[in-house]
Design a protein with these regions (language model features):
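Bacterial N-terminal signal peptides that target proteins for export
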Residues: 1-9
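Bacterial N-terminal signal peptides
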Residues: 8-20
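Sterically constrained small-residue positions within well-ordered secondary structures
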Residues: 16, 118-120, 204, 273-274
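Primary recognition of N-terminal secretory signal peptides and signal-anchoring hydrophobic helices
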Residues: 23-143, 153, 161, 165, ...
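Active-site-proximal helix/loop segments of hydrolytic enzymes
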Residues: 145-354
């Protein structure tokens, strides 16, 4: 009787996933639970995307197609797509000779990056630019610059470039004054058909350098920057797929244009990302604490370069996902589900989870 009920449940889920507007993949995915986290076999992933072995990053397992090459290692959270670094929510695991990736990373990172075919309802018309810090809050400080000034300089240059492309721009601040994080989010949430880009510059060890871009950590996951493991819904998680698509478009262009060290697209629960109801990223343009990098960041030429990269990324994002879908064969829906038929004892929780 139990087997029959499981069969009916699997059949019902398959029918739901194969309704019009949903892409059903050939084959099945087996979901396994490892230390409380659901994983899928990477061999199933490669087969689903029709990936074959490729020459990729040294020391990594690399698979791909003509368009993408993916590289990763067992027991690490680094995940590379076309040599751009992402940080997974859970490490790649090796069990019984099989490499495995968490199902939440498949839904919330890998699939939206490899197949950004989802489409938002309206085209992007407005960009909310948030120059971090301001007023008495200087952010990171060195002998060469204050972070609040660098943030505002890049933001103003970005505004000009976006306006030249026909976008409306809203600045959370356009001078040296302080805003609370809640005020910044309130401004962004009041602007329809927009994205939110918070501009910052980093601080750390003297030798630390490079660019990193943050999006909100998926529900129920943690990260070095997530502060806590959260299972409740946050408003920002309603745009998980759009967040990672926007981060990919901006970050890849910034790394390519600047030649900076790629510190990756990472997950966090920064306050400005948690309660925002628009696609949102937090961009870190380099390290104020690194004297050589800070001197470079203080120049107009480098500020223009960063602003131009962010502008290009926003335009590319708009052209890719902010248009009516020709076919609803989306890699992800609003809930971020992987569109494939799956079997195994954990199929129901996998297919329903947001």
């Amino acid at each position: 009787m139990r087997q029959y009920l499981r069969y009916l449940l699997t059949l019902l889920l398959a029918l739901l996933l194969c309704q019009p507007g949903v892409l059903c993949a050939q084959g099945t995915w087996t979901v396994s639970e490892l230390d409380g986290v659901e994983y899928v076999k990477l061999s199933d992933v490669w087969r689903f995307y029709r990936f074959t072995p490729k020459k990729g990053r040294p020391g990594c397992v690399s698979y791909g197609s003509g368009k993408h090459v993916v590289s990763l290692k067992a027991n690490q959270q680094d995940f590379y797509v076309n040599n751009y670094r992402y940080v997974l929510s859970h490490p790649v695991r090796e069990e019984g000779g099989e490499l495995m990736i968490s199902s939440v990373d498949m839904r919330k990172l890998v699939d939206p990056v490899l197949r950004p075919r989802f489409s938002v309802q309206n085209r992007l018309r407005t960009v909310v630019i948030d120059p971090g810090h301001g007023g008495h809050d200087a952010g990171a400080v060195s002998a060469y610059a204050k972070e609040k000034d660098l943030n505002l300089a890049v933001a103003r240059k970005l505004r000009t470039m976006l306006e030249n492309q026909g976008y409306r721009v809203v600045m959370t601040r356009d001078g040296d004054y302080f805003l609370t994080l809640q005020q910044r989010v309130a401004i962004a949430n009041s602007v329809p058909d927009s994205v939110f880009v918070s501009i910052h510059h980093n601080s750390g060890r003297r030798a630390a350098s490079g660019i990193e871009t943050f999006t909100l950590a998926p529900q129920g996951t943690t990260s070095p920057f997530a502060r806590s493991r959260r299972f409740d819904d946050l408003a920002g998680n309603n745009q998980d797929s759009e967040n990672i698509a926007l981060a990919t478009a901006v970050h890849s262009r910034a790394i390519r244009s600047s030649g900076a060290i790629d510190r990756g697209i990472q997950r966090a629960r920064f306050s400005v990302l948690c309660t925002i109801n628009r696609p949102a990223i937090l961009f870190e343009g380099g390290f104020v604490s690194n004297p050589e990098e800070c001197r470079k960041m203080a120049t107009r030429a480098y500020q223009n370069l960063l602003a131009h990269s962010i502008c290009q990324g926003i335009v590319a994002y708009n052209n890719t996902v902010c248009k009516p879908a020709r076919k609803v064969a989306a890699a992800t829906s609003g809930s971020g589900r992987v569109r494939t038929s799956m079997s195994g004892s954990r199929v129901s929780s996998y297919s329903r989870e947001k």
